[in-house]
């Protein structure tokens, strides 16, 4: 049983404790008129969902309020993953499951039972197309969600009385219903071919003549591929009916070891794409693996960054700059509703920055989920309708450095009363404001040579070495960091962290940007894309990391055959 299944069982068990006696004695009772309209839908899942939704419109406990909004969302998730270590296949898994989320809102659009966390009941749904089985799950989940919503509404009304100022924003924005039934997506990957690639790639440390000489320094070598095909079904009492989906694939290599002083080092690399065919070819994957192994050995032999703290210019590659924006910028323009009783606009760092400058004037940022490709590469964050049934919109977030818009779902925030099509949901989770395809663009961008010349000019002007970073790891830790002398000589260093790389750095520290946009696709719970160019910061701190060095292995690794 996978982790998601276990988690869902826990959620279902916990929420079932709250449910009281079921409202209906049998699921066989139907509304004939509603059933006839739902029967026109060809998809058996949508038809069953619509039939049960029509039936649940009569949901009412004696003396209690009737729901003003009910939504059924079913995620049909097919996944595949294969992993190889040290030249042998170690894991291969295929999984198919369906997860249902039922949302019931009590009250009205102005004030309802919802909270900033998002409410709903989650249950596993049958994986076949048995309509009666699905309707039973919908029935019990709706009953539970309704009772939970009644309790939440009562508690919220009591809480609102404690605040002196009245609530200024609606809890839920009204939208026009939309009907769109898109083709079902499926996993499409040559599994045997990829298993062969993974086995070969994970064993290259011991077989390729270019890297075999330092194989004893490689403590792990892992290659993996994974794919997901998610079809999302949604119906609600406003009349929206959707079936839409996406596919995503990643092929990656991860190698690691230790330097002679015990410092742990790694190189993690790969490609992410909307289709398996867009992933790297077998030859490119092999080449990348060898390059990563060589890079790991170079890191092992590289000096530790100077113990003297540094403040000065750092040139970030497009890859690294995209990671910086993913971490520091994007979450803060996704306008999630704050807790009750607060005057904040959103929960992010830019809550009070509306109409203020948050980036240099030369930079503008747009989120355009409707763009599906860039320079021939598929964009994972693209979509046409969000997960709340609102058509996607291109949003100019930052215009010449000034914050002009937030990304908004159907839960309004101050100054933004309607959705701009950015309500997106992870499987089984409530929808929140999330980005789609972020474009960071610069006025008068510089070429790579011009950026390097600008960096060296700053080094000469300040009379000291400067830095350039190619890739970042988690927490924005530099993975490939080079010290650059004023004459242009580069030296790889290790063991560094950035100091004070934060939103203030984005606002005031970027002095130039390149004409080399890098596409960063993220195959997370909500697929997203960020496209950003190289960026030159004029004042970033670089210092030696405070790390507890690990002991080296006590004895040598197994001898390679033929060595």
Question: Which residues make up each language-model segment?
Answer:
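Intrinsic-disorder/low-complexity regions
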Residues: 1, 30-31
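N-terminal secretory signal peptides that target proteins for export/translocation
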Residues: 1-11
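Intrinsic disorder/low-complexity detector
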Residues: 4, 15, 33-34
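Active-site bordering "gate/hinge" segments
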Residues: 31-385, 399-400, 499, 503, ...
């Amino acid at each position: 049983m996978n982790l998601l299944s276990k988690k869902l069982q826990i959620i279902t068990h916990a929420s079932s404790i709250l449910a009281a006696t079921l409202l209906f004695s049998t699921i066989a009772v139907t509304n004939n008129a509603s059933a006839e309209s739902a029967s026109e839908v060809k998809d058996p899942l949508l038809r069953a969902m619509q039939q049960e939704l029509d039936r649940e419109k009569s949901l009412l406990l004696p003396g209690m309020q009737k729901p003003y909004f009910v939504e059924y969302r079913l995620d049909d998730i097919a996944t595949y993953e294969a992993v190889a270590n040290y030249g042998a296949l170690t894991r291969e898994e295929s999984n198919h499951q369906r997860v249902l989320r039922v949302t019931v809102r009590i009250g009205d659009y102005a004030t309802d039972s919802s909270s900033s966390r998002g409410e709903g009941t989650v249950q596993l749904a049958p994986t076949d197309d048995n309509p009666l089985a699905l309707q039973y799950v919908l029935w019990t989940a709706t009953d539970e969600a309704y009772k939970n919503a009644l309790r939440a509404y009562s508690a919220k009304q009591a809480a609102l009385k404690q605040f002196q100022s009245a609530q200024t924003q609606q809890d839920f924005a009204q939208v026009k219903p939309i009907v769109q039934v898109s083709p079902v997506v499926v996993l499409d990957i040559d599994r045997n071919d990829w298993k062969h690639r993974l086995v070969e790639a994970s064993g290259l440390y011991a077989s390729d003549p270019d890297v075999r000489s330092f194989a004893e320094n490689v403590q792990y070598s892992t290659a993996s591929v994974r794919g997901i095909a998610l079809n999302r079904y949604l119906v609600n009492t406003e009349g929206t009916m959707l079936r839409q989906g996406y596919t995503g694939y990643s092929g990656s290599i991860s190698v690691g070891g230790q330097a002679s002083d015990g410092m742990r080092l790694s190189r993690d690399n790969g490609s992410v794409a909307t289709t398996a065919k867009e992933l790297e070819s077998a030859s490119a994957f092999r080449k990348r693996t060898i390059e990563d192994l060589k890079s790991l050995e170079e890191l092992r032999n590289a000096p530790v960054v100077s113990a003297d703290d540094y403040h000065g210019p750092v040139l970030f590659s497009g890859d690294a700059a995209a990671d910086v924006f993913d971490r520091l910028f994007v979450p803060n323009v996704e306008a999630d509703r704050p807790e009750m009783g607060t005057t904040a606009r959103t929960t992010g760092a830019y809550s009070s920055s509306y109409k203020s400058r948050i980036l240099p004037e030369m930079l503008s940022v747009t989120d355009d989920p409707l763009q599906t490709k860039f320079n021939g590469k598929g964009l994972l964050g693209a979509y046409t309708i969000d997960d709340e049934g609102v058509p996607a919109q291109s949003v100019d977030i930052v215009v010449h450095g000034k914050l002009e818009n937030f990304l908004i779902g159907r839960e309004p925030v101050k100054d933004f009363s309607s959705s701009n099509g950015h309500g997106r949901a992870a499987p089984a989770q409530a929808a929140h404001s999330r980005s789609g395809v972020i474009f960071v663009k610069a006025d008068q961008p510089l070429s790579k040579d011009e950026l390097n010349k600008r960096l060296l000019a700053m080094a000469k002007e300040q009379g000291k070495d400067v830095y350039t970073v190619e890739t970042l790891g988690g927490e924005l830790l530099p993975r490939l960091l080079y010290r650059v002398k004023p004459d242009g000589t580069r030296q790889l260093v290790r063991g560094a962290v950035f100091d004070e790389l934060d939103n203030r750095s984005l606002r005031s520290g970027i002095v130039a940007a390149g004409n080399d946009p890098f596409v960063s696709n993220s195959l997370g719970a909500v697929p997203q894309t960020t496209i950003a160019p190289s960026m030159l910061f004029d004042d970033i701190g670089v210092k030696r990391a405070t790390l507890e060095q690990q002991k080296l292995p006590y004895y040598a690794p197994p001898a390679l055959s033929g060595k």
